[in-house]
């Protein structure tokens, strides 16, 4: 049976770093309050001339190098983003051009913070169907450009960055993506959204969020989704080496671990260094886990994310 094997992982964070203390110069907050409430210590912010496609391309190049494959071996590029360079064309086609992947077709998907898990599921199905062999899956966001920097309830939470994974068809029965599950509930679309849109008012707008309710949904739905994928594969918490949750808030990660009785040392946490990077969150956390020596070959990991829509999903993978 064909499996989608992770060949390489790459990441990119802009050079500019904004600490919590720097935010206190423009809004009423404190480093202590932000760290206690979110676990965030700093965030990376893109330069004015830096585009989402630039960051995505940088992360992709590192992933390709890590995988040890040539750019022309890529059959498909999927970019998960809420902040593309332009309304159209897709960010993925711009990345394809910048990379020079002449043999690939490319498109974007938008599921906000769940975007990377959605993209992994789509890529996995393309590979399993035999339509493609090797896929570049990228999550990239410039969230700083859709923030109200005077709204302390949202501007302290987000950062910019990109992460990428190279997936390739494999017949190794014990490695690769084992299964995914995806969910949506549009009745909650007004809990997390932007104040603008192409058809709505012709401007990008800024992030608006009912933080308390989103927080509650995140704990409930991430927990249920993790239990669902474990049940589907006849696995228990003890069978999983690592849990890589969307890096939105340290308290969400802690409370999901507590609710499911997951030993906290199994939780991958990188939010302190880059804040909530939306669709880039999962691959950035994976890159951190790999580069820090935690994530090793043959480890079993659960990737889980939730975002606006609401959308949420989980991916079970053996590295």
Swiss-Prot record:
It is found in: Cytoplasm. GO terms for cellular component: cytoplasm. Pathway: Lipid metabolism; fatty acid biosynthesis. Residues 247-251 are annotated as: ACP-binding. Gene3D superfamilies: 3.40.47.10. GO terms for molecular function: 3-oxoacyl-[acyl-carrier-protein] synthase activity; beta-ketoacyl-acyl-carrier-protein synthase III activity. GO terms for biological process: fatty acid biosynthetic process; secondary metabolite biosynthetic process. Keywords: Acyltransferase, Cytoplasm, Fatty acid biosynthesis, Fatty acid metabolism, Lipid biosynthesis, Lipid metabolism, Multifunctional enzyme, Transferase. The active site is at 113, 246, 276. Its EC number is 2.3.1.180. CDD domains: KAS_III (cd00830). It catalyses: malonyl-[ACP] + acetyl-CoA + H(+) = 3-oxobutanoyl-[ACP] + CO2 + CoA. It comes from the Bacteria. HAMAP family: FabH. Belongs to the thiolase-like superfamily. FabH family. Catalyzes the condensation reaction of fatty acid synthesis by the addition to an acyl acceptor of two carbons from malonyl-ACP. Catalyzes the first condensation reaction which initiates fatty acid synthesis and may therefore play a role in governing the total rate of fatty acid production. Possesses both acetoacetyl-ACP synthase and acetyl transacylase activities. Its substrate specificity determines the biosynthesis of branched-chain and/or straight-chain of fatty acids. The last Arg residue of the ACP-binding site is essential for the weak association between ACP/AcpP and FabH. Homodimer. This is Beta-ketoacyl-[acyl-carrier-protein] synthase III. It comes from Ehrlichia canis (strain Jake).
